[in-house]
Amino acid sequence: MKRFTNILVVFNNAIGAEDALEQAVSLARDNAARLTVAVVLRSTEASPQRIDETEKRLQRLSLGVQHAGVSEVDTLVLTGTPFLEAIRQVIRAEHDLVFACAEPDNVLKQIFFGSTATHLVRKCPCPVWIVKPTQPVPYKKILVAVDPKISTSEDQINSLIMDLAASLASRDHAVLHIMHAWDVDGNDLDSIRSEITTEQREAILERHHDKHLLALNNLLAGYPTSELDRRVHLPRGRPEQAISRLVRQEQIDLIVMGSVGRIGIPGYFIGDTAETVLGSERCSILTVKPNGFKTPVLSH
């Protein structure tokens, strides 16, 4: 899989940082990609001594990365708010993928400030891979959550995440679970909530199921079953609930999904599904934005 050529790892002291680095090294080696390992120190932590110690630590780390087979390795010590400095680095150096580890649950911190991972998924212009600790590598089971529509922009993001998930499944020889959660919409939603016969209700549900199945089959037509061990799921219901059920039932290792639910206010929202999954699931998550996404973070 030669998709990524310029990878950034946001490295910190959290549990799971080593796991994120290990996965980034593996992908960089497979892609012959440049790898940048960055530590972001908050301004209150960035004493000259702390910066010097961090630089020396990164130098030692880079030798290990090179020994693992990555020839182009850069290290950086940045100062400021972690997610802001990481995104600014992405803009400056045109990174095409960011690795970060999930932070330990801290409800108050996330309520008032938001986690670094959540901010990256919301606002980073390139794909973001959030690694949760102790995930097995290579992955055995990958879930891609799609929502095929008629809209060109939505078709585009579905194709992006399908391409990426299929490439990863092929690389790791993993089972690829493809899920599209659907529900009744429009006037039919009012109809099934009203007093109609069982036969009428079932006819409405069948019509919507078939419509979504057709859209999903059209999307999957470009991904031959002979090349992938794939399982297709078409549950009715809210996407975040369907994803959670499937993650637990199938013991999914990685979720690949889009992170922008609506186009309109760049960067200041995240699709409800992606944010819910990011905060609740214990597997790693790779999120992708549509082409043309504009980050609200300035490069300086």
Question: Which role fits each region the language model picked out?
Answer:
Residues 49-50, 198-212:
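A short acidic, glycine-rich active-site loop
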Residues 1-50, 141-199, 280, 290-295:
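Small/aliphatic-rich secondary-structure junction motif
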Residues 1-3, 16, 23, 45, ...:
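Structural beta-alpha unit
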